[in-house]
Amino acid sequence: MKSKHLALLLPLLFLVGCSDPEQRPVVQQVKPPARAQGVDLPTDAGRVAQYIKGSGLDFVARYYRKPDSRWPALSANEARVLSALGLNVVAVWESHSHKRDYFTYGRGYWDAVAAARQAKGVGQPGGSAIYFAVDFDATVADMYPIDQYFRGVTAGLAASNGGSPEYKVGVYGSGAVCDAVKRAGLAQYAWLSNSTGWAGRSFAGWNIRQGRPYAHLGFINHDSNEARDDYGGFRLAGM
C-alpha cells in the first residue's frame, strides 16, 4: 500500500519540483534566414558571372524582350553559365513598360506569349516566375489598364501551355502597382522599384526590392536588389 501511495505522489512531487520560479524554460533563438542579394542588368551577365559570384551575390535578374530591342535578351547560354555557378536567375519581361498608354489586355496577352516562348527556349523550368514590368509612377487612373494588362498576361501564359500556365506571374513596379496587382490575384510575386518618389514606396509585400546598396560592382548599368523568401528565381535543370 505504501508503495502504491508513493507511486501516486511521484507525479505531484515532479510538478512541485519543476515549479521553481528560477527555473525558466530555455528558448532557442532561431536566426532568421539571410536575405538574398543580387543585381539586375540589361546586358549579357555571362561575361561577368564569375565576378558577380565572387562578390558574394545570390541572383541575377535578366530580361526577355521583343526582337527589335537594342538590348540583348536572356539567352540559354547565359542561363547555363549563371546556373553552373550557383546563381539564381530572375526573369523579367520588359517592352514599352514606361508608357502609360501601352497597357491593354491585348498587349498583356501577346507579351506573355512571347515571354513564355523565350522562357522555354532558355530552359526556364515550370513553376518559376516571369515578372512583367510597369516602369512609371502609375496613378489611380492608370490601375484599370494595368489590371487589364495583367489579365491578358494570365490568359497568354495559359494559352502558351495548353490552357494551364507553366510559369507564375510577377509584377515589377511602384508599391501602388505591386499592391493593386497582387490584391487582384493577378501576380504571385512583387518586385518593388527603386524609384523612391513613386506612389506606395512603403509597400511591405515585396519579394524583391530594388536599390538596396549591397552590390558594389565595378561595372555600370546594373541595379542592386535584395530578395526574401521565395522570389521566383530559377536555375536550369541539373545545375
PLM features: residue spans?
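Long, well-ordered alpha-helical scaffolding segments within enzyme catalytic domains
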Residues: 113, 142-164
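Functionally critical loop-and-helix segments that line ligand-binding/catalytic clefts
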Residues: 29-45, 49-52, 178-239
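Hydrophobic faces of well-ordered beta-strands that scaffold small-molecule active sites
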Residues: 35-39, 59-62, 89-92, 128-130, ...
